Amino acid sequence: MTFSIVARSTDGPGGEPCWGVAVASKFLAVGNAVPAAVAGIGALATQAEANLSWKGIGLSLLDEGATAPVALDRLLEEDDKRDHRQIGIVDVDGTAVSHTGSACFDWAGGITGTDVAIQGNILTGPEVVEAMKAAWDASDPTAPLARRLLAALVAGDEAGGDKRGRQSAALLVVSDGAGYGGMDDVAVDLRVDDARAPIGELSRLLDLNDLYLTASTEQEKVAITSELAAEIDGLVRAAGHPDLAAWTGTENYEMRVADDGSWIDVQVLAILRAGK
């Protein structure tokens, strides 16, 4: 009833590794059940007749030094319903494994490669996971992991996806020094719990996440000259704020404007000029 991709890349802040999961399903709030990840440890997706305890147990095993194959073996040997379970795991080094129990509803299966595990059940056919793997392989390895995961999810959906239909989707990416203010390991944690087109909505939310919760790149920073400062001052005052800092805080653009007022993000400047 679900298709997912679990992966590792090195596009985190400063080039640090990051891990993530993207998942979609004809199931309410799939993001509440399937994905789990911790920076510096790994990521996993537990699905089919999902054993949700595998999230905590699996990450604990990885944290203790188990490789993905060892962690998988431990999880399976302690679960009497292993034949009904499906799971994908990627460990700290990018070793990937995927398990599909023999009792999972057709079509069910998975594909693995370096840094990636893809799996699904109740799918239209193997073309779903194959399309996801092809999209992953074709993606730019330097691109943000969230974008690569989403592209794979879109490919799986377009190839047929869950044969029962669509309902929810989720995206989770972790990396040290990520998140709001760079003081967490959660770079992306987005969920569409109940929608006709959940993957499309997830894409819209990721655009917003990038704007509000991702730091500007050097290419996106516009130096605030005296001339631009005067323009900005007029714009923020017209919007009812005493200065740029007040406008920035009110509109939640803290990660897109320098604390010392030396630069402003090109997108945020466009928004300010448009009076939005």
Placement of each model-derived feature along the sequence:
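N-terminal nucleophile
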Residues: 1-226
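Structured segments of extracytoplasmic/periplasmic soluble domains
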Residues: 61, 78, 135, 152, ...
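A short amphipathic alpha-helical interaction element
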Residues: 218-257
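Extracellular LysM carbohydrate-binding repeats and other cell-envelope/extracellular binding modules
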Residues: 252-276
